[in-house]
From Swiss-Prot:
Segments passing through the bilayer: none
GO CC terms: cytosol
Family statement drawn from the similarity comment of this UniProt entry: Belongs to the phosphopentomutase family.
Keyword Metal-binding in record: yes
GO term, biological process aspect, one: nucleotide metabolic process
Record-level Gene Ontology MF annotations: magnesium ion binding; manganese ion binding; phosphopentomutase activity
Catalysed reactions, semicolon-separated: 2-deoxy-alpha-D-ribose 1-phosphate = 2-deoxy-D-ribose 5-phosphate; alpha-D-ribose 1-phosphate = D-ribose 5-phosphate
Name assigned to this protein: Phosphopentomutase
Localization: Cytoplasm
Cofactor(s) essential for the protein: Mn(2+)
PANTHER family: PHOSPHOPENTOMUTASE (PTHR21110:SF0)
Organism this protein belongs to: Sinorhizobium fredii (strain NBRC 101917 / NGR234)
EC number of the protein: 5.4.2.7
Note accompanying the cofactor annotation: Binds 2 manganese ions.
Originating gene: deoB
Amino acid sequence: MARVFLFVLDSFGIGGAPDAEAFGDLGADTLGHIAEFCASGAGDRAGLREGPLQLPNMSALGLVHAAKLATGRLPAGMPLPERVYGVYGAASEVSRGKDTPSGHWEIAGTPVRFDWGYFPAEGDAFPPQLVEAICREGEVPGILGNCHASGTDIIARHGEEHMRSGKPICYTSSDSVFQIAAHERTFGLERLLELCQVVRRLVDDYNIGRVIARPFVGDNPGNFTRTGHRRDFSVLPPEPTILDRLEAAGRTVHAIGKIGDIFAHRGVTRLTKANGNMELFDASLTVVEEAEEGDLVFTNFVDFDMLYGHRRDVPGYAAALEAFDARLPDLDRRLRPGDMVILTADHGCDPTWRGTDHTRERVPVLMFGPSLRSRSFGIANSFAHIGETAARHLGIAPGPHGRSLL
């Protein structure tokens, strides 16, 4: 029996989505544009990084080849490696959104074929009757924000008034989300989480995918900082995922980071919380040592998306990729015969793109392990094939929406 380690580099798209134009994202390419900026010097930042994008380990696993499959061109400053050591390719999403739950659920074998509900971008984002119900049932004196916004911007804009008034900061984006920011000291973390549970129930009628708690600390706009106590309150996946199938087969599903929240904790048998990419990697390595035969270890590396993609920070994103890449040998040294690692992403978030939202892109799929021989599988027409590849490797029955890429 084998083990599978499924690592999602949140938002690390590689461009080329065949339906990108329908999402307003024609030409978006997270990897390609980061590489282009770095090759031109626009990705330099004093004390952080400089020069072309350096991802030698992922390149050796087929990343550059996958990018060329997705877009027809090589990322600037990233030559083809002399040898590839993994099974590689690109995957297109069939789910109707470009959001986190849709991407992860499809990776786990369950595409999202329905349309999420969204809040309007102009005027008040939330209907008056919803706001009234939130204030009444959540026992708050009102809300601030009530608009589409960047999380860091809206905290800077309304944070002080929130601390004075006790009104939570409520906002949304182009994703199907209702986000609530509140100060951990003056409002209270537990109170924020309780409010999110109230709102989760109230927005079910609007078909909203997630309610997200965004706690922060600080005493003025200059030092307001979001903490690592974020929580996502998601709806359940529409069908059983590979997590459910593994749980039913008596296997252990290790959910690291926000994976548990994304799947509403369904099919998760062991939860490990960690904050920040390096802490998430360390936690994953610990579980690699502990996981038993037949286990799935599923980690989301959120910083790429949360800290750099949405904030349109090219040098930060590039440095985070390079730091992640440098840790891969630590993982490789811990693998046992029969183990398989899958590196992929759930959507794009091109830091050079207009706005602050996700971008519709293909994603890389890089697989390696002691028993895998190098080859390309080409372009998969659904993320669901990723989950089915893991299912076959772990020896459980196939699901209805994909096939193994091996």
